[in-house]
A protein has these predicted regions:
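Accessory nucleic acid-recognition modules appended to NTPase machines
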Residues: 202-370
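Interdomain motor-coupling "hinge/lid" segment immediately C-terminal to the ATP-binding subdomain
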Residues: 129-252
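Short glycine-rich substrate-engagement loop in P-loop NTPases that contacts/grips substrate
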Residues: 54-87
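Conserved lysine of the Walker
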Residues: 32
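Hydrophobic positions on the alpha1 helix immediately C-terminal to the Walker A/P-loop
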Residues: 35, 39
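Pre-Walker A adenine-sensing motif
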Residues: 1-17
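Conserved catalytic cores of phosphodiester-cleaving nucleases, focusing on short active-site segments
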Residues: 348, 352, 371-390
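Hydrophobic anchor at the beta1->P-loop junction of P-loop NTPases
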Residues: 24
Length: 435
């Protein structure tokens, strides 16, 4: 059973006074349903679970009066074998985007405040304009992502104490013993090749069979393509899929990882395809890393909406866009050139995205300085360079020297920990999970 960090959020939610309904957001197949079901099993006596895709007739419960008493009575007739007791029963409405009246009902569950209600579903189908009264102010949100590297380590049997020991080297900025470092790099390469989609991770834990992993990844990708075909407007269907499938080429097959419309279609232009990128973003199928024209806080003030990199929301999906041999090269550490640098940059971006950071990158055509990724942490800008080899980070060194308000920067490498006098903290790639 895969342990997820989202469970801790849910436990805190249970103990919140005057708690609201909880909406679990996130892309498809990231473990939302599984996590809620396991949470209910461990914390409640009873679970009322309605999946509106599997049980469309259950929408009738929400077709009349939306008083809590009326809805509970409808559930009791629908599930006579279940007990619905305040505080002891969790009501879980899954695939809620299929039932707009159920979305509206969240306000009344929250006002009544007797029953614990969690809802989940893809963002794709929720048409806010069709919901007669979207429950603004009556819901809390939990964003779920694919499995991150620390969760992957838990699944591989690495205990919390072992991870705490590893983090001790990070805090003290001392070299990780080679036996530990080498094994961690092996785990990290496995994680990159597998990605964080729970089905793929569980299959690897059970079988260690990369052919099976590949099959699952491709099936997941087909599911995302189906969602584009099912939910996108007629105008966006083909364009959005073209943009999505181009991501592997954008990120791995060229040195410049900026999203270029010409890679989507010969002669492609922003005027034609930008709305498709916006649709993919709203659908939780991509996340963006925007160019900034300055390295000062607040980076968002200097961000350009028209100049960005677009990443898949999990590495599993990126792997599915490439040949099986890429996974072999990653695990065996035999990648070279643009693919190696691109893969590591994607892995670092993936980790930061799953931590909830907005991502930026910097490039100055005049000075030729460029920074792979920039985030804001504890009120300061943190520049990050990703090196496929242990090469110099001249741009990072220059930025730190010229900006006193940027106290440090990270250089992530296929190597061990090191600290320089110029504020550059060199870390192994896997340490991105723990900063």
């Amino acid at each position: 059973m895969l342990k997820r960090k989202a469970t801790n959020f849910m436990k805190n939610w249970i103990n919140t006074k005057d708690k609201k309904c909880l909406i679990v957001q996130g892309a498809r197949q990231t473990g939302k349903t599984y996590t809620v079901e396991r949470f209910a099993e461990e914390n409640y006596e009873e679970l009322i679970e309605i999946n509106f895709k599997q049980m469309p007739s259950a929408m009738e419960i929400f077709s009349g009066d939306l008083t809590v008493d009326a809805m509970v009575m409808g559930m009791r007739f629908r599930f006579p074998e279940k007990k619905i007791i305040p505080g002891k029963t969790l009501i879980f409405l899954d695939e809620i985007q299929e039932c707009q009246e159920a979305v509206t009902s969240l306000k009344f569950w929250a006002i009544d405040n007797k029953y614990d209600v969690i809802v989940s579903g893809s963002l794709l189908g929720i048409d806010y304009k069709r919901a007669s009264s979207y429950p603004v102010g009556y819901v809390d949100y939990l964003k779920m992502y694919g499995i991150d590297f620390e969760e992957f380590l838990w699944g591989m049997g690495i205990s919390g104490d072992m991870i705490e020991n590893l983090c001790g080297y990070l805090r003290s900025k001392t070299i990780v013993p080679e036996a530990i470092h080498s094994q961690m790099m092996n785990y990290y390469r496995q994680y990159i090749a597998i990605g964080g989609m729970p089905e793929a991770v569980q299959k690897y834990i059970d079988t260690k069979d990369f052919r099976e992993i590949d099959r699952i990844q491709r099936s997941l990708l087909q599911g995302y393509q189906y969602d584009i075909a099912h939910y996108a407007t007629a105008e966006e269907k083909v364009k959005a899929e073209k943009c999505y499938i181009s991501l592997a080429k954008q990120l791995l097959d060229k040195e410049n990882h900026k999203f270029q419309y010409k890679e989507v279609e010969h002669g492609g232009r922003a005027q034609k395809y930008f709305s498709s990128i916006e649709w993919l973003l709203r659908a939780d199928m991509v996340h963006l890393c925007k160019l900034v024209t300055d390295v000062r806080f607040d980076l968002d003030d200097y961000a350009r909406d028209d100049f960005f990199r677009a990443y898949t929301t999990d590495l599993s999906l990126l792997m599915a866009m490439k040949d099986f041999s890429l996974k072999q090269h990653i695990v065996e550490n035999t990648l070279f050139g643009n693919s190696k640098g691109g893969i590591y940059e994607c892995a670092i971006a993936d980790a930061l995205y799953k931590k909830g950071y907005p991502l930026y990158f910097y490039k100055n055509e005049t000075t030729k300085r460029k920074i792979d990724v920039m985030i804001q942490k504890d009120g300061v800008v943190v520049p990050i360079e990703v090196k496929s080899g242990n090469t110099r980070a001249n741009s990072l060194k220059s930025i730190l020297k010229m900006n006193a308000d940027i106290p440090y920067g990270y250089k992530f490498v296929d190597g061990n920990i090191g600290v320089s006098d110029d504020g550059i903290i060199t870390l192994p790639l896997y340490m991105i999970a723990f900063i």
